[in-house]
């Protein structure tokens, strides 16, 4: 908007050049998964050009085994996880091209933008009481029985600019067997493994916590299409971290059923007005660095069930890289693809020094649950 007099709006880029968004990068030696994950973490934390549509795709060459990768970064205002995955699916081989491609339209004149901004300001002031009421009601509806004070841990410190990425992998079918045995969901199984893994790392630090507050996604979408914008909210849930993994899973499955019943989308409705209000006073980053509502994020996406191909090459793996912010130094992203379940672990290595140990603990938790749920054959 001109002179910063209103909220940003979407306009067509009449001078769009694909070279501004798609780049090629050689992976540093030795070109293995570890090196690729370091490249991906750096790309995700590299600021997007705000003067253009906020997305970037980087083709990473020089990987072992003749492989190459594509690291796609979307700003959260452009697409949430579901929308981003839908966009990527449309790039895969086998889908027909778009039926029609709309020509770009010129942006509105400055006077119209200024008039619209002034109108929005007047409406915002008139609707302020209702906005505050929705925020209060949304908090009440989405956080019943949830403490606003997550346990204090040394992993919850203001984060810096660096990130590291690692991935734990298990067969999706085996996880479904575990979930079925405990009347749980696949995501419940991951949550049980995540809380156990974080507790294991904290115990090494001399911190004996028994519960964690985990933020899980709540979709406000009506479909899984590639609509513009972010339509996902969050739901903070107090989950057990101590005790036997199977008992913990049973407890988590019960808690998640109770928390999700009748509350889908409640927190999504309050996030936009709440953060808009905080942004007005420049308090967003201050609050995120000091928040005591959650300990970690766990996002989950259902990816393609069948293997994909891109430019004729088989897509061997798909990994989600979600960001961390404020004083949440560790976050987890869950994505299924072609019979596998990938759980990415992204962390600030200056706060979470035990990133490799945390990933190994997560892999151990998942594998142990699978082994105990699989009938022995003899």
Locate the predicted segments by residue.
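Soluble acyl-CoA-dependent acyltransferase catalytic core bearing the H(X)4D motif
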Residues: 1-328, 334-340, 345-363, 367-378
